[in-house]
Amino acid sequence: MVMTQWDIVGGEFVASAVKATQYPQDTVDEVAFIGRSNVGKSSLLNSLARRKGLARVSSSPGKTQTINFYSFRAKKTTEKEPLRHTFYAVDLPGYGFARTSQSQKNQWSAFICKYMENSRDLKLVCILMDIRHAPM
């Protein structure tokens, strides 16, 4: 089996959402990133896009409080010109240690669950784990 390798050639912020009507309305494959607060989800997206500051990061848990959509462009490693293949990288709020009220955490949990249950375009969920902490 031959596997195609891809290079990410750019990323742009598209939208922040807390309900389905705020999601991008085009049909594009989505890859979601989920994990504990401050595990590095936003930092990973910045690294993949090779753009410091694309996704906002903080040393304080709970910086990401909405579902954030980023449009990424990719090309096959064997091709010189970027293919117009686009996917959304979806940065989800972290769970566990955000310094916020329980009601706010419950709201985050509700809109994350609705997104994951109802997105037609969600193709992959990447769970990030920090090996310094036991899974929740």
What are these regions (language model features)?
Residues 97-104, 134-136:
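Conserved ATPase-coupling elements of RecA-like P-loop NTPase cores
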Residues 103-132:
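Inter-motif core of Ras-like GTPase G domains
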Residues 74, 132-135:
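Acidic pyrophosphate-coordinating catalytic loop
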Residues 1-99:
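Conserved G1/Walker A P-loop phosphate-binding module
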